[in-house]
């Protein structure tokens, strides 16, 4: 199978009309320019095409290890806005109403297995640390986070997350 890798803003990725059966967006949906994207997706999806949106987050108000990790993130990055997640539906901007109909929506809990090392890696990769801090700050955070995990977490554990999924079907007759 030949797969072409393309790095481009979703709103103007160049594909012929009616190319895809399904387009997915996982974790990135809030960052799009929705007025542009809704129309563009409608164009590149086949006549019975779907747009699936997924989001997943740990629940620090219900999971002690996640809460302690977030507390440490906030010590290093007090301006981080990705904290204190709670279960919520994916908000779909009105721009999609003209082009799509809601077909399915689900919200559910999932216990995600981690080791101390994999949880440290997951936290280090979050935008509050890996995308925001200097290399020296990341190293200091990681040292402190690993020490914290030694104190509060067994070698293997689960972190409570919620997942939200929406599937929208392309409206006919607008091409």
Region roles according to the model:
Residues 31-41:
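A short, conserved alpha-helix within the catalytic core of class I
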Residues 42, 46-112:
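Conserved catalytic/acceptor-binding region of the Class I
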Residues 89-175:
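Conserved Class I S-adenosyl-L-methionine
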Residues 22-26, 34:
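A short beta-strand submotif of the Rossmann-like class I SAM-dependent methyltransferase core
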Residues 11-23:
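A short acidic, Gly/Pro-enriched loop at the edge of an enzyme's catalytic core
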Residues 10-12, 30, 58:
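Active-site micro-motifs of SAM-dependent methyltransferase domains
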Residues 6, 24, 52:
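Conserved Rossmann-like nucleotide-binding pocket used by diverse enzymes
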Residues 1-13:
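Class I SAM-dependent methyltransferase SAM/SAH-binding core
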């Amino acid at each position: 199978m030949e797969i072409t890798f393309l790095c481009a803003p979703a709103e103007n990725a160049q594909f012929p009309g009616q190319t895809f059966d399904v387009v997915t967006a996982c974790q990135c949906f809030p960052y799009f320019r929705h007025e542009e994207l809704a129309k563009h997706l409608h164009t590149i999806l086949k006549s019975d095409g779907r747009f699936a949106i997924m989001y997943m987050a740990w629940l620090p108000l219900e999971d002690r290890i996640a809460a302690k990790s977030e507390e440490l993130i906030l010590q290093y990055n007090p301006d981080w806005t990705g904290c204190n997640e709670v279960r919520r539906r994916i908000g779909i901007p009105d721009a999609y109403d003209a082009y799509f109909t809601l077909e399915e929506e689900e919200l559910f809990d999932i216990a995600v297995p981690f080791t101390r090392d994999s949880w440290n890696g997951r936290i280090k990769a979050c935008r509050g640390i890996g995308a925001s801090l200097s290399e020296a700050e990341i190293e200091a955070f990681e040292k402190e986070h690993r020490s914290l995990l030694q104190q509060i977490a067994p070698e293997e554990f689960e972190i409570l997350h919620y997942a939200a999924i929406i599937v929208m079907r392309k409206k006919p007759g607008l091409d």
